[in-house]
Amino acid sequence: MANMASVTYAIEGSQKNLEEILGAICLAMTDKKHWTEYKACEHLGFSEQELDGKWLGGEIDDNPTLDNGVLRFYAEERWGLQDFEELLRQKFPDIKVYWVVEERGNEVYCTNDKEGKYFPERYWVDTAQDDIYNSEYFSTEKEIYEWLSKITHGRVKCKEDVEKFNSDYEDSGANDENFIYIHKFEIEGEEP
């Protein structure tokens, strides 16, 4: 079974091009609820031969938005970023496609938004303390440790404290789940 990745897109371009992409996405969602990325590419005029061998198994959510020259949408894609972005750039060479990918099953956290224009968060922190679960996104390590200090009542203030926190609970044999995981978004892919 495929691990599903959450992919969020922010696309800049001319109003005409963005409306064409949005229209294709909306048509794809009315066709079927499966393979909406593939269907959107068909509606953009790609032939079956052009799509053959491409990874286009993503499902685009029901709420794409076009506002102030930016098309935004979210997709669930199998194993991570697929070929949808590449095909959009091929059809519309003047667009800029920004994305962020989270695939928690294989610990994949990445973005091509180097400057943080649309996706400024660089960390996702996942915690459990006495079976109380929390997760937050952060732009800086300083923000992470301020938040962790608050939720751990001052116990965790730095990287070494995180390691100690995790080690203490692993060594204790306690039945409750206690952990702190800090996931960093890597900068990858072609810049928009």
Predicted regions and their residues:
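Charged interaction segments
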Residues: L44-P192
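Exposed alpha-helical structural elements
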Residues: K16-I21, K39, E143, K164
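Short, extreme N-terminal segment that most often corresponds to the first beta-strand
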Residues: M1-D31, E188-P192
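Short amphipathic alpha-helix segments
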Residues: I21-L22, T30-K32, Y38-D52
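A common structural junction motif
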Residues: C26-H34, K91-V97
